UniProtKB/Swiss-Prot annotation:
It holds the Pfam family Peptidase_C47. One of its GO terms (molecular function) is cysteine-type peptidase activity. It is an enzyme of class 3 (hydrolase). It comes from Staphylococcus aureus (strain NCTC 8325 / PS 47). The cascade of activation of extracellular proteases proceeds from the metalloprotease aureolysin (aur), through SspA to SspB. The record marks 219-220 as: Cleavage. Prematurely activated/folded staphopain B is inhibited by staphostatin B (SspC), which is probably required to protect staphylococcal cytoplasmic proteins from degradation by SspB. The lineage of its organism: Bacteria, Bacillati, Bacillota, Bacilli, Bacillales. Its EC number is 3.4.22.-. Belongs to the peptidase C47 family. GO terms for cellular component: extracellular region. The active site is at residues 243, 340, 360. This is Staphopain B. The gene is sspB. Residues 37-219 form a propeptide. Induction: Expression occurs in a growth phase-dependent manner with optimal expression at post-exponential phase. Environmental conditions such as degree of aeration and salt concentration are also important in control of transcription and processing of SspB. Up-regulated by agr (accessory gene regulator) and repressed by SarA (staphylococcal accessory regulator) and sigmaB factor.
Length: 393
């Protein structure tokens, strides 16, 4: 090939390479712009401080994907690629904050769960945030509400009082989750306002950072799951005191593989003389729980404390239902939910750590938390101590 041909070929190759470089730079710029636009529209949640104890960060990043995958499996949802948003806090209207950290769990671009890190046992309630032992829990708590405004460039504060949970945005307060109380008002708009002190203390979080998990690691995180084969959520507690009725109905439906039990019918059986108007205020006592179970052909017995992981595993394999009995840590005598009952659905091993799966009648989905934690941080910002169990449903 003569020198003029070589020069012509070299020039053509150079032009092609420069063109490809320009195109790739353009694509990179467009991609970055798209990412920037996406981030600019993301939800921001106000917090007093974005400082989070390192042990909380580590636990959240280590555990969230396995927890999400395990909960997806329970609802027969397709697993996906899980990401973790930034931690946020929940405040009372006077500015007090609770003792937990909350993370949005994102799957395929949607907020699907909330990961909660809260004190592990009663003794931890008196420790500093840095010295506290934390329990990890996952549920759908306010996840759908957050997802609805995730891409609307919203800036909110998450608030709570005895009536439920609220989002405050641009001075307007909106109720998103109402506490299950008899006669509770369910209006979505609220005249409440954030205290001046809290407004002064709040600052905006940075754009939520998504921590991407390696796909191979996600596959290995859930080593084992064991649940009551026929457990289904058919109803939800709201404006009544029937937590034990809901729990017994769900467990008996599961272990008998039927759909004939419901909370209202159980409470009506226990209180045949009470009017329909007064029935929502009726609670259930341990002797009633035992007697009702026996009337349905079940040998129910009370066991103090939290059952061991091995016991839950075996009882679940044997198709035997366990009802959690819990007491509010606050011990407020005016609290209509001073005591609470929940249903154990099964157990799991995630990241080689033992977990329990349970249903809180206040919720529409299951929750998963550490098997060695006796403290239950439930949907309405309440800490309950798991003091005993009714076994045999």
């Amino acid at each position: 090939m003569n020198s003029s041909c070589k020069s012509r070929v070299f020039n053509i190759i150079s032009i092609i390479m420069v063109s490809m470089l320009i195109l790739s730079l353009g694509a990179f710029a467009n991609n970055n712009k798209a990412k920037a636009d996406s981030h600019s529209k993301q939800l921001e949640i106000n917090v007093k401080s974005d400082k989070v104890p390192q042990k909380v960060k580590d636990l959240a990043q280590q555990q969230f994907a396995g927890y999400a995958k395990a909960l997806d499996k329970q609802s027969n949802a397709k697993t996906g690629k899980y990401e973790l948003g930034e931690a946020f806090k929940i405040y009372k209207f006077n500015g007090e904050e609770d003792n937990s950290y909350y993370y949005p769990v994102i799957k395929d671009g949607k907020i699907v769960y909330t990961l909660t890190l809260s004190p592990k046992n009663k003794d931890d309630l008196n420790k500093s945030k840095e010295d506290m032992n934390y329990s990890v829990k996952i549920s759908n708590f306010i996840a759908k509400d957050l997802d609805q405004i995730k891409d609307k460039n919203s800036n909110i504060t998450v608030l709570t009082d005895e009536k439920g949970f609220y989002f405050e945005e641009d001075g307007k307060v909106r109720l998103v989750k109402a506490t299950p109380l008899p006669g509770n008002v369910k209006e979505k708009e609220s005249a409440k306002t954030v205290s001046a002190k809290l407004k002064q203390e709040l600052k905006n979080t940075v754009t939520p950072t998504k921590v991407e998990e390696n796909e191979a690691i996600q596959e290995d995180q859930v080593q084992y799951e064991n649940t009551l084969k026929n457990f289904k959520i058919r109803e939800q507690q709201f404006d009544n005191s029937w937590c034990a009725g809901f729990s017994m109905a769900a467990l008996l439906n599961a272990t008998k593989n039927t759909d004939t039990y419901n909370a209202h019918d159980i409470m009506r059986t226990l209180y045949p003389e009470v009017s329909e108007q007064d029935l929502p205020n009726c609670a259930t006592f341990p002797n009633q729980m035992i007697e009702y179970g026996k009337s349905q052909g079940r040998d129910i017995h009370y066991q103090e404390g939290v059952p061991s992981y091995e016991q839950v595993d075996q009882l679940t394999k044997d198709n035997v239902g366990i009802m959690i009995l819990a007491q509010s840590v606050s011990q407020n005598p005016n609290d209509p939910h001073l005591g609470h009952a929940l249903a154990v659905v099964g157990n799991a091993k995630i990241n080689d750590q033992e977990k329990l799966i349970y249903w809180n009648p206040w919720d529409t989905e299951l929750s998963i938390q550490d098997a060695d934690s006796s403290l239950l941080h439930l949907s309405f910002n309440r800490d309950y101590n798991w003091y005993g169990s009714m076994i045999g449903y």
